[in-house]
Swiss-Prot record:
Residues of the DNA-binding region: 17-21
Family indicated by similarity: Belongs to the histone H4 family.
Name of this chain's protein: Histone H4
CDD domains: HFD_H4
InterPro entries named among the record's database cross-references: Histone-fold, Histone_H4, Histone_H4_CS
Amino acid sequence: MSGRGKGGKGLGKGGAKRHRKVLRDNIQGITKPAIRRLARRGGVKRISGLIYEETRGVLKVFLENVIRDAVTYTEHAKCKTVTAMDVVYALKRQGRTLYGFGG
């Protein structure tokens, strides 16, 4: 063992990080029809034009909170991969228990 801890085999020497593309405006990937479909599933019949940007903003804040908590669980476990259970625990912490993904 080369003293790299667990998972240290075959991963190279762990040199400099590669430049990662900065992600911007990905929230626009949540399209108007996608928001409309979610609203239809929730029983909405008619949708105001102002709803779409508002929905994107709310969804962004919600996902940021869940992902922050999930990554915190992952880092505490000294892992590099966020698992489904990390997300389940993050949602449970926020009072939104999710069933069907283990645990």
